[in-house]
Amino acid sequence: MINPNPKRSDEPVFWGLFGAGGMWSAIVAPVIILLVAILLPLGLFPGEALGYERVLAFASSFIGRVFIFLMIVLPLWLGLHRIHHAMHDLKIHVPNGKWVFYGLATILTVVTLVAIVTI
């Protein structure tokens, strides 16, 4: 018999943020690390393309702020979700682990949002 009042789960929201963080960390973050940490210092990427004025102008624009926000927040959700489930798999039971890890991710997301808005 089908339960007429099924219990709703909040897990799809967290899995969505986890999945988005995983895709971002796999596709976008390596490109940025390659550009900023390898190609630019070796002189294989024109330095004036990432000059201070251009980077500041990009970071001050709406698209730049969204990019920086996503560059910080999505990997953060990925990492905290992985830590939460790793603790569960290792049978290290954190009291109210869901509140601890997802609450920390939410707090850090709000802190990042405030920081990005006030740039």
Swiss-Prot record:
Keyword DNA-binding on entry: no
Keyword annotations: Cell inner membrane, Cell membrane, Membrane, Transmembrane, Transmembrane helix
GO MF entries: succinate dehydrogenase activity
Cell membrane among keywords: yes
Topology relative to the membrane: Multi-pass membrane protein
A biological process term (GO) from this entry: fumarate metabolic process
A GO-annotated cellular component: plasma membrane
Main location: membrane
Parts of the chain that traverse the membrane: 26-46, 58-78, 99-119
Membership in a protein family: Belongs to the FrdD family.
Role noted for this protein: Two distinct, membrane-bound, FAD-containing enzymes are responsible for the catalysis of fumarate and succinate interconversion; fumarate reductase is used in anaerobic growth, and succinate dehydrogenase is used in aerobic growth. Anchors the catalytic components of the fumarate reductase complex to the cell inner membrane, binds quinones.
HAMAP family registered for this protein in UniProt: Fumarate_red_D
Protein name: Fumarate reductase subunit D
Record gene name: frdD
